């Protein structure tokens, strides 16, 4: 379902939802390099993974949809950690979908069940969330895909509202003023 490209290591990550794994390809040759995961509930195992994203250090974040978590792998494909669980509390997931990482390492997860985007720190602790159910700007109806560009603009595919919403993350430098 999801794709992520690592231009530094020349790798293409393909989330293969029905196979419950992530296939890694060499960008130059198109040849397979390795496969991450298999069906299961353990570390590095998946139950219908859907989306993937990379941070600046080459860590891979994979939405493990039916295990209700995000799994993190190092640049070599080794399991690092996972966060999230099914529930209705802060930081829990109902239907995790898209995942993206900003320039400061914050992890964004679109949750189609809660109609929001949850933002986590690098340790998987919830910082805040955006949205809620609705059709107004800043509200969502089944958000799915996420992408964050090089200027920290957050693009959210708001599926049933038939739109893409764009948000801007404002970095606060040592001056205390938002960066533009």
Predicted regions located by residue number:
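Eukaryotic scaffold repeat domains enriched in small/polar residues
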Residues: 1-180
């Amino acid at each position: 379902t999801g794709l992520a490209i690592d231009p530094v290591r020349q790798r293409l990550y393909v989330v293969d939802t029905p196979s419950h794994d992530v296939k890694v390809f060499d960008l130059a040759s198109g040849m397979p390099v390795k496969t991450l995961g298999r069906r299961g509930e353990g570390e590095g195992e998946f139950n219908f993974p859907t989306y993937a994203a990379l941070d600046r250090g080459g860590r891979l974040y994979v939405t493990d949809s039916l295990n209700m978590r995000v799994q993190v792998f190092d640049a070599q494909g080794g399991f690092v950690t996972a966060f999230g669980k099914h529930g209705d509390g802060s930081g829990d997931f109902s239907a995790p979908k898209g995942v993206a990482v900003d320039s400061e390492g914050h992890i964004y997860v679109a949750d189609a069940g809660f109609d929001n985007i949850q933002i986590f720190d690098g340790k998987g602790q919830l910082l805040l969330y955006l949205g809620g159910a609705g059709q107004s700007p800043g509200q969502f109806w089944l958000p799915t895909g996420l992408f964050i560009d090089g200027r920290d603009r957050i693009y959210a595919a708001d599926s049933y509202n038939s739109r893409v919403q764009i948000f801007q993350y404002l970095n606060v430098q040592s001056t205390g003023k938002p960066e533009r």
